[in-house]
């Protein structure tokens, strides 16, 4: 799935659409990528001379990847995150890096979902954690 296809499922738009591509494998694991160009707004001032993607943005990249696991359930719904747990930051992500996420659904009941996600660069783990969210009706005027 490319960015245009992803936009059919996620309400995010530039500059906050943080998934460039996503594939769902036969085991229902989402594999997504986001290439950090160095032009992103969140790198301005974080940190001058040594830009690093903020941890909260890395969590958002994982969150969007997790939401895409339920892509068929997303139509007409919005994801509202209810928790980010057991997050561990291991390595930094910098301009020029491609963040690769593996996300797995670990729990689902009614409209509540819990996923585990790992974000890596070149096979080196940068952050991991559990993300929980609810799917609620999209009541925005379109």
What do the PLM-derived regions correspond to, one by one?
Residues 20-23, 85, 90, 102-106, ...:
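Conserved positions in beta-strands of structured domains
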Residues 16-18, 99, 113:
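Hydrophobic core residues within well-ordered beta-strands of beta-rich domains
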Residues 11, 27-31, 93-97, 104-142:
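HotDog/MaoC-like acyl-thioester-processing domains
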Residues 65-100, 130-134:
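Hydrophobic beta-strand-centered segment that forms part of the acyl-chain substrate-binding groove
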Residues 1-6, 97-101:
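Short Pro/Gly-enriched beta-strand edge/turn motifs at strand-loop
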Residues 22, 53-76:
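Active-site helix/loop of acyl-thioester processing domains in fatty-acid/polyketide metabolism
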Residues 14-53:
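Catalytic strand-loop segment that frames the active site of acyl-thioester-processing enzymes
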């Amino acid at each position: 799935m490319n960015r245009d296809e992803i936009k059919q499922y996620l309400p995010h738009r530039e500059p906050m659409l943080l998934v460039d591509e996503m594939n769902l494998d036969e085991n229902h694991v989402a594999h997504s990528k986001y290439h950090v160009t160095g032009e992103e707004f969140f790198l301005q001032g974080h940190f001058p001379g040594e830009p690093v993607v903020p941890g909260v943005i890395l969590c958002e990249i994982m969150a969007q990847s997790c939401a895409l696991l339920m892509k068929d359930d997303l139509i007409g719904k919005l994801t509202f995150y209810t928790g980010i747990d057991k997050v561990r930051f291991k390595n930094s992500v910098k301009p020029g890096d491609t963040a690769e996420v593996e996300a797995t659904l670990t729990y689902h009941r009614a409209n509540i979902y819990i996923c585990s996600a790992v974000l890596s660069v070149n096979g080196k783990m940068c952050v991991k954690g559990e993300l929980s969210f609810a799917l609620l009706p999209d009541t925005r005027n379109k």
